[in-house]
Amino acid sequence: GYLTHFIVAGACFLSAAVVLAGLKKGTPVNKTEQLPLSQLVGAGLAAARNPRIALAYASAFIARGDLVVVGTFANLWGTTAGIAAGLDPAEASAKGRMLFAITGIAGLFWLPLMGIMLDRVNRITGTIVCMSLAAAGFLVVNVVDDPLAPGAWIFFVFLGIGQISAFAGAATLISQEAPIASRGAVVGMFNTFGAVGILFGTAVGGRLFDSIGPHAVFVMVGALSVLVVLYGLWVRW
């Protein structure tokens, strides 16, 4: 465990050094008066009057919530299933991490295909497709009885595809719709909605996991994704 953390920390420092060496130096600029935080927040919220930006905010909420659900609860589900099957905690934890690895690898290979699609379609349509994949990926997990069963991995492949699709759709939509005059405030609010999604997914998901079961967490995210899809259809047509 310690070795893993040291390796990750070393990779972060190495990446930081490469970025520091490779970034082009900026040109001198004149300092201008900073707007108060309240005005920046107000500008970000006011931008949600544009239904396309509101859709991007909602998608960010889901996409970041997806991330924490997959990273935390898929892992936890695999670990608890392993312990219930009689594995020792270390081996069960490894099984749980394997589920997360499957979702991550699936997303890694799927993302280039999703990027090609998003470049060729209307961004609203692309977001609807992405959120539909997210809804399907999370809801299909409901049919899994044992996450460690030999054939269960395919459902976690779909889960990884859905999770990365939601993230890609939200990011591409806000990059197009954020107005130049208030781009910083709008992108900041977009990320704030994402942070709220992380908190929501952690808090509510944890309670559902304990009180109902692992499936409930994924069904919750899938159902919320369906709501975003319906809103996207309204915005598009």
Enumerate the language-model features and the residues they cover.
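Intracellular juxtamembrane helix-capping segments at the cytosolic ends
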Residues: 165-178
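Juxtamembrane intracellular "pre-TM" segments in multi-pass secondary transporters
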Residues: 25-58
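C-terminal ends and interior cores of transmembrane alpha-helices
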Residues: 132-146
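Pair of pore-lining "gating" transmembrane helices in MFS-fold secondary transporters
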Residues: 52-70, 157
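A late C-terminal transmembrane helix in Major Facilitator Superfamily
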Residues: 177-210
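Helix-to-loop junctions at the C-terminal end of transmembrane segments
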Residues: 109-123, 209-210
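C-terminal membrane-cytosol helix-exit motif in multi-pass small-molecule transporters
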Residues: 10-29, 231-236
